[in-house]
Amino acid sequence: MTSLVLEPTSTALWQALVSDAEAAANRQLDETLESYLVLTLMRFTQRPELVSSVMALEFLDSAQKAGQQQHAQLRDVGDKCLLVSGLFPQNAKRRLVSIGYFVNMGRSAYQQLHDKIHGFYGQLAADFIPMMDVLHAMRELNDQSQHIDLLDAFELWEETGSQHALERVKDGSSGGHMIKRDWIDGADTSH
């Protein structure tokens, strides 16, 4: 008698990683957002050049296109910005812009797409920050050195209201860094 051994699919592995990251970030994405994030991660692994493009030019170029071509380009810009802001925040530093720059561009791309074709792109724009927080937690799951640095976390929290960045600031500020702990504890977290 032969036994059947089922290998987990890459979709199942990504799903498990996203679920673990949600728990680590103390964020619960709804099923639609979770599925979209898994599919975006799967698509990225097949096209790693996605994050090396100049997204601002692609975003501007999308205005010159129409129909499906424009929709695909706006989706790609939103997805790339999500991945850069969540998985590769160090790329923002290399490009001499804040992580919030990619957040704002990604949210704008998704919102424009929603304005054109509706669907769930409005939800992607609205929940960009929680998805980014999950991706930050994903980076940190196996390597705590993957935290964004304290000043970048402070800037990200201040610009976007990222709860994960705020936790990073709180954790870092308790270690004697120069950010005033009483100011952080009293900060408005309702972004």
Enumerate the language-model features and the residues they cover.
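Polar/charged low-complexity regulatory segments
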Residues: M1-H191
